Amino acid sequence: MPRFTKTKGTLAATALGLALAGAAFADPVEDGLVIETDSGPVEIVTKTAPPAFLADTFDTIYSGWHFRDDSTRDLERDDFDNPAMVFVDRGLDKWNAAMGVNGESCASCHQGPESMAGLRAVMPRVDEHTGKLMIMEDYVNACVTERMGLEKWGVTSDNMKDMLSLISLQSRGMAVNVKIDGPAAPYWEHGKEIYYTRYGQLEMSCANCHEDNAGNMIRADHLSQGQINGFPTYRLKDSGMVTAQHRFVGCVRDTRAETFKAGSDDFKALELYVASRGNGLSVEGVSVRH
C-alpha cells in the first residue's frame, strides 16, 4: 500500500492538518450505559483504565459510545430501540437454518447461540491448531465451508454481518481481553506498525485521528479513540451493520490510499492491535454509531 503521494495530496493533508489544529475539543460525554434486554438490565463498562502499553497515552480509555450525541447513545440503551437487533434476529434465523449440503445447521453442532458466549471478547486470537491469527469471520467460514460444504461467505457480506451480530451479542457485558503476548506478539507488532504508519495522499495514520486528535471536533464529528468493542455496529450513516474489517477499509480509503482488503493478513493484525487498545472495556454486543 502506498504510504503517500505528494502534490495535491500534500496540500490536502496540510489543509486537514490546519483544520485539526483549529478544531474545538470536547470531552467525552460523562454518562453510563445500562442496556435493557429481555433478560434484564446489562451494565456496560464504557470507560476504564488503559492497558499498560497505553498508560503514557491515555489516562482513561472510552468506548466510542461516549463520543456520540444523546439520541444516538439512547438508541443503545434498550434492545427494543436498537436497530442492530434486526440483524441479530436475521443471524438467529441463519443459525437455525439447515443450510448445509446434508441439512446441517449451526445449531446441529453448537446447539444454541449462547454457546458462543465469551468468544467475541477474546477475538482476534491465534488458533492453537494452525498457529495463524484468526478473526471471527475465519471461524464462521471454517464452519460454512468445512462442515456445511458451502461456498465461503464474503468477509463483509450480509450473511457474515448477520452471523457476527448474533455471535457478538452473546458476549455483551464481558470484558475485552485479547492476548498480545506469546504466539500473538508478532501479529500484534505488525498491527501496531500499521496503526502508526501514514498512508495515502493525506499522509495520515490511525493514530492521527484516534490518538493525537481524540476528543477534537472536526466536520461536526467528535473524534473518538477508535475503540472497536462495539463492533459490529449499526452505523446510522450507512443504515446497516458495519464490522471492524469493513470500517478499516473505509478509514484507510479516507486517507486516499489504496487500501488493504477486508480479511487480509494486514487488517487481521490491525484488528488485533486495535482490539487490544480496548482491553478492559465491555463488549457492547451490537452498538449504534453515527
Curated annotation (Swiss-Prot):
SUPFAM superfamilies: Cytochrome c (SSF46626). Its cofactor is heme c; Zn(2+). It catalyses: L-cysteinyl-[SoxY protein] + thiosulfate + 2 Fe(III)-[cytochrome c] = S-sulfosulfanyl-L-cysteinyl-[SoxY protein] + 2 Fe(II)-[cytochrome c] + 2 H(+); S-sulfanyl-L-cysteinyl-[SoxY protein] + thiosulfate + 2 Fe(III)-[cytochrome c] = S-(2-sulfodisulfanyl)-L-cysteinyl-[SoxY protein] + 2 Fe(II)-[cytochrome c] + 2 H(+). Cysteine persulfide at Cys-251. Residues 1-26 form the signal peptide. Binds 2 heme c groups covalently per subunit. The active site is at C251 (cysteine persulfide intermediate). InterPro entries: Cyt_c-like_dom (IPR009056), Cyt_c-like_dom_sf (IPR036909), SoxA (IPR025710). PROSITE patterns: CYTC, MULTIHEME_CYTC. C-type diheme cytochrome, which is part of the SoxAX cytochrome complex involved in sulfur oxidation. The SoxAX complex catalyzes the formation of a heterodisulfide bond between the conserved cysteine residue on a sulfur carrier SoxYZ complex subunit SoxY and thiosulfate or other inorganic sulfur substrates. This leads to the liberation of two electrons, which may be transferred from the SoxAX complex to another cytochrome c that then channels them into the respiratory electron transport chain. Some electrons may be used for reductive CO(2) fixation. Heterodimer of SoxA and SoxX. This is L-cysteine S-thiosulfotransferase subunit SoxA. It comes from Paracoccus pantotrophus. The gene is soxA.
